[in-house]
Amino acid sequence: MESPPTCRKTSCRMKKASPVSRSGRFSSGPGEDAAKFTESISFDRRLWRHDLMGSIAHATMLGGIGVLTKAEAKRIVRALEAIGDDIEAGRFDWDESLEDVHMNLEAELTRREPAGAKLHTGRSRNDQVALDTRMWLRDEIVDLEEELRSLQQALVVLAQANDDVIIPGYTHLQRAQPVYFAHHLLAYVEMVERDRERLLDAFSRVNVCPLGSGALA
């Protein structure tokens, strides 16, 4: 049986120089329309803080089990923290050609610290995306829940300040009976409370670590 031809061209090697994901099998970059269609950095850059936190934890773990040396792990963590400082200060240049927040941060990390190329050991990109999304959602739920509690407190204060005010209660677009304005406001407090309970339930579902699941688990 004839052996399959061996590709000797640099562009055919699986090892790629480009930091763009999935670029190893292609000799040139995507067309402009394809690049615009597949990029997500325009909206997923909001995950940068959680992506860095996950990478810092992963680097620390790799250093702990000996995949990275202690010195490498420390240098990677320092580089990730410095990248976070630059983003916070508005000094980070997001590159749309790198497609998403993960590749942007990974490219900058390996530029600053060559040992950063080892960081993805034992971690699927799918793990990383799921982790970032869950951490971001967790923070958003906490913030929204706090805002709802503030709204409830404001409604209670307003109800207490108007405990003797009477307003018409409507049914079928007609005035049906007199009701206390305070009772009307407190009804909304209870409605918001049910929304808070739903958020807290969502938090318990989101607050699960997906690391180690890989692409297909």
Regions found by a protein language model. Give the residues of each.
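Cationic, amphipathic, low-complexity segments that mediate targeting or membrane/lipid association
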Residues: 2-6
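A helix-coil-helix interface module used to build multimeric assemblies
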Residues: 15-217
